[in-house]
Amino acid sequence: GCIKGATWFSFDPKSNFDHLYMTASGVGSCRLIDLEQKTVTMLPDLGNKTERPTIINWTVDENQDMIVSRDLSNNGAVNIVLSRASGFKTKTLLEDSQHKQKGVTGAFVHPKTGTLYYTLYETQPMWRYDFATKEFTTFASHMRTKETLRMVVHPTGKYAYLLRLYSSQQNSYIARMDYNEVLDKFSEPYIIAGHASKAGYVDGVGGNARVNGPGQGVFVKNEDYTGAEDEYDFYFTDEYNHCIRILTPTGRVTTFAGRGNGSTEGGYADGALRTEARFFHPWAIAYDEKRKCFYVGERGEKHDGTKQAVIRKIAQEE
């Protein structure tokens, strides 16, 4: 089938890495990619084009219901819960009656507490929703208004990354928020890679590195780090550099795949990760722990997702 506008990937935690959900914000319906049956199914119940379902998370209770965060253009319930028991058809709106909200661009669920954290495009304060108390509160602020931020929490819940996918000022960075278990609170974000006022393509450490449109990322265990305080590398899409990068626990950014044959332009090319492979505006990425491979979702020739695009697989040759 035709794939357009891949925005975000999320594995169903009860599917043993067989069911991969994909959003296509602003372009079309969400999809279920069944990796076991090798089928793709349109899912209009998860939201339509105007509702712009963008991020998918899961509750941490025994039900592990689906949470869809929406980039609404008008005020409304920016987060909804779809029950697993209903086949993800029955919706519960998480709407804050005290504050008008629209335009979620990033969200995650803390793996230990189950609290939902999210950020809005037009305002700086970031929000949290407590499922137990049903309370909405702010907890920190990001750098500027009108920046599209993706959010990814570490598997341990000890910290989370903010990835600036878009800003009208054309700058890109990855920031980090540290979690205080005693206070049940995240710190204010601080930049660990890239620059708040610059964008580009440079492998390096911390502020010396340059990125240009970091989007979704995924933590993957590195066997070389066994026994270390942090055993995970962070793989992330870099849209305008048309590649996949790695951020190590020490803050070093390297290029994992893309920009084959020395090209700085986007394109479609399979082959060796660094010498041949090329991508076109990658936004989504997921790691399949069962099959030991990555899936990369691209926006295609036009980053708005209106052109036909593809989902690529990165795996060791058999």
PLM-predicted stretches and their roles:
Residues G1-L35:
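An edge-strand/N-cap motif at the start of beta-rich repeat modules
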Residues G1-T7, G26, Q37-I55, D71-N74, ...:
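Gly/Pro-rich loop segments of beta-rich domains
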Residues F11-F17, V60-N63, V109-T113, V153-G157, ...:
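Residue-level detector of Asp-centered blade-edge/turn motifs that repeat once per structural unit
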Residues D12, H19-V27, T59-D61, V68-N74, ...:
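Conserved beta-strand positions in repeat-built beta-propeller and related beta-rich domains
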Residues G28-R31, G76-V81, Q124-W127, S172-A175, ...:
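A short loop-to-beta-strand structural motif that recurs across blades of beta-propeller domains
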Residues Q216-V220, D224, E229-T248:
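Loop/turn-rich, solvent-exposed surfaces of beta-rich toroidal or solenoidal domains
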Residues H281-E318:
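Blade-level signature of beta-propeller repeat domains, shared across WD40, Kelch, NHL, RCC1
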